[in-house]
């Protein structure tokens, strides 16, 4: 059968084509040198890439495991504005009506949710305070001998709104004089569907004696700026959530000439507490998590968002003399 291709491709004895005119095969030694050079170049590129990747991994690891070093950070940041001079007019807006948040108390007490208050019999002393401030859904029923009943202000986080409103007999009707201050990110408080503000408004219509305010978006930003100014840390970039204690302390400084805090431990408490000693995080949850486990895990965790309880306490300690804040049960400065 005849081959339809050119003769040079049909003849099995034909040698493969040689190099183009004017070019000769490279000597073996030169080809070997070029192959060695290419291999060295590839090795160099690999080493450089490996070094860059290693640097990135180490940088990410250091960033992820970075711990708040409050003492060194604060020295590099400017001192924040005096909280006593913060504008109060548009900071807290009424949930219903056009009332204005009461703006002055001489002596205030903050009753924390700490189990350190159990067995203290502080109830009568707390009842005599001019203004009392409580947080979230910390109850007084069944604990009044230690924590009292009087509640002038209750600062409530967005995450605790439903826990508070589900128990109106405890939190609304029991102390009708209570003024509620709700705080939360604007995207949670005012989102188009399922707005927490609407939920609180409906509760206000059901309980006409309920006086409630919300922290304005502008003031929420001020709280963030204050945290950054005090710690040198951006709240969002450091994956931090400000705690209700942070909001409560700042609000107390704004409202009160003197502040006494019951049940808050000092920032170094967990490093000195005996390991076998266990204290519930909340006085009303005896089987709840241990306080130091909660503090330490939140302080050092970098996945998700966490409260920096220990860092916040260091800030509060620095405010004690400046704003007339005292601490007891346990006592510290």
Curated annotation (Swiss-Prot):
Role this protein plays: Transfers the sialyl group (N-acetyl-alpha-neuraminyl or NeuAc) from CMP-NeuAc onto glycolipids, forming an alpha-2,6-linkage. Produces branched type disialyl structures by transfer of a sialyl group onto the GalNAc or GlcNAc residue inside backbone core chains having a terminal sialic acid with an alpha-2,3-linkage on Gal. ST6GalNAcVI prefers glycolipids to glycoproteins, predominantly catalyzing the biosynthesis of ganglioside GD1alpha from GM1b. Also has activity toward GD1a and GT1b, and can generate DSGG (disialylgalactosylgloboside) from MSGG (monosialylgalactosylgloboside).
Species this protein is from: Mus musculus
EC number: 2.4.99.-
Tissue expression notes: Widely expressed, the gene expression is most abundant in colon, brain, liver, and heart.
Coiled-coil features, chain-numbered ranges: none
Induction context: After inflammation stimulus.
Record protein name field: Alpha-N-acetylgalactosaminide alpha-2,6-sialyltransferase 6
Region listing for Disordered, in residue ranges: 1-27
Side of membrane Cytoplasmic, spans: 1-43
Segments passing through the bilayer: 44-64
Cysteines paired by S-S bonds: 108-256
GO CC terms, sorted: cytoplasm; Golgi membrane
Pfam families in the record: Glyco_transf_29 (PF00777)
Family under the similarity heading: Belongs to the glycosyltransferase 29 family.
Keywords: Disulfide bond, Glycoprotein, Glycosyltransferase, Golgi apparatus, Lipid metabolism, Membrane, Sialic acid, Signal-anchor, Transferase, Transmembrane, Transmembrane helix
Ranges facing Lumenal side: 65-333
Biased segments, Polar residues type: 1-12
Species lineage: Eukaryota, Metazoa, Chordata, Craniata, Vertebrata
């Amino acid at each position: 059968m005849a081959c339809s291709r050119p003769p040079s491709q049909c003849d099995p004895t034909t040698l493969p084509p040689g190099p183009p005119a004017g070019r000769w095969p490279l000597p073996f030694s030169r080809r070997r040198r070029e192959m060695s050079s290419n291999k060295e170049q590839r090795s160099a590129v690999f080493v450089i890439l490996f070094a860059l990747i290693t640097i990135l991994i180490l940088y990410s690891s250091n960033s992820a495991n970075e711990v708040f070093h409050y003492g060194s950070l604060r020295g590099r940041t400017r001192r924040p504005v005096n909280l006593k001079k913060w504008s109060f007019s548009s900071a807290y807006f009424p949930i219903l009506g056009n009332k204005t948040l009461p703006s002055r108390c001489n002596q205030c007490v903050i009753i924390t949710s700490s189990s350190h208050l159990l067995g203290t019999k502080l109830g009568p002393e707390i009842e005599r305070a001019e203004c009392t401030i409580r947080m979230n859904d910390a109850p007084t029923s069944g604990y009044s001998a230690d924590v009292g009943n009087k509640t002038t202000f209750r600062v409530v986080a967005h995450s605790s709104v439903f826990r508070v409103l589900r128990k109106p007999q405890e939190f609304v009707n029991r102390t009708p004089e209570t003024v509620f201050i709700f705080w939360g990110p604007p995207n949670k408080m005012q989102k188009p569907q399922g707005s927490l503000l609407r939920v609180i408004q409906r509760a206000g219509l059901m309980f006409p004696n309920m006086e409630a305010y919300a922290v304005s978006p502008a003031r929420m930003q001020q709280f963030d700026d204050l945290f950054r100014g005090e710690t040198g840390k951006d709240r969002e970039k450091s994956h931090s959530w400000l705690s209700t204690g942070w909001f409560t302390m700042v609000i107390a400084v704004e409202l009160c000439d003197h502040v006494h805090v019951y049940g808050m431990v000092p920032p170094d408490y967990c490093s000195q507490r005996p390991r076998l000693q266990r204290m519930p995080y909340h006085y009303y949850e005896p089987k709840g998590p241990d306080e130091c486990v909660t503090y330490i895990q939140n302080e050092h965790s970098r996945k998700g968002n966490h409260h920096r309880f220990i860092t916040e306490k260091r800030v509060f300690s620095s405010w004690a003399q400046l704003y007339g804040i005292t601490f007891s049960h346990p006592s510290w400065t």
